Amino acid sequence: MAGKGVGSRLSTLFLLVLLVITIGMMQVQVAEGRMCKTPSGKFKGYCVNNTNCKNVCRTEGFPTGSCDFHVAGRKCYCYKPCP
C-alpha cells in the first residue's frame, strides 16, 4: 500500500510541474504575439464577411483583418504585430 501513495504523489507532482511550465509558456506567447488593431482605410460599408475584410487589409500591407463590433455596428479592422 505504501508504494501506491508514493507513485500517486510522484504523478501529482509531475502533473503540477507540467502545468506550471505550460502556463509559463502561454504567458510568453501572449506577450510576444500581441496584435495592434487599426481601422481599415479602404474597406467600405458594413463589415459582414471576415474574408473580405482580411483581403482588403492585405492590400493595405497588414497580414490580417476581421470584422469587429464598433459603436456604429461592425467595422473592418486590420491587425499587425505590435512593435
Curated annotation (Swiss-Prot):
Q: Which Gene3D superfamilies does the UniProt entry name for this protein? A: Knottin, scorpion toxin-like
On whether Glycoprotein is a keyword of this UniProt record, the answer is no
Q: Which GO terms describe its cellular component?
A: extracellular region
The cross-references to InterPro entries, in alphabetical order and at most eight, read: Defensin_plant, Scorpion_toxin-like, Scorpion_toxin-like_sf
A Pfam family that this protein carries is Gamma-thionin
PANTHER family from the UniProt entry: DEFENSIN-LIKE PROTEIN 1, DRO1 PROTEIN-RELATED
Query: Which protein, by its recorded name, is this?
Result: Defensin-1
Which compartments is it annotated to reside in?
A: Secreted
Q: Which cysteines are joined by disulfide bonds?
A: C36-C82, C47-C67, C53-C76, C57-C78
Q: What is its main location?
A: secreted
- Gene assigned in the entry: Def1
Question: Where does the signal sequence lie?
Answer: 1-33
Q: Report the family membership.
A: Belongs to the DEFL family.
Role summary: Plant defense peptide. Has antifungal activity against B.cinera, F.oxysporum, F.solani and H.annosum with IC(50) values of 0.4 ug/ml, 2.9 ug/ml, 0.9 ug/ml and 1.4 ug/ml, respectively. Has modest antifungal activity against C.albicans and T.reesei. Causes thickening of F.oxysporum hyphae and an increase in their branching. Lacks antibacterial activity against the Gram-negative bacteria E.coli and E.carotovora.
Family matches, as CDD domains: Knot1
Source species, please? Answer: Pinus sylvestris (Scotch pine)
- List the keywords (alphabetical): Antimicrobial, Disulfide bond, Fungicide, Plant defense, Secreted, Signal
The GO annotation for biological process reads: defense response to fungus; killing of cells of another organism
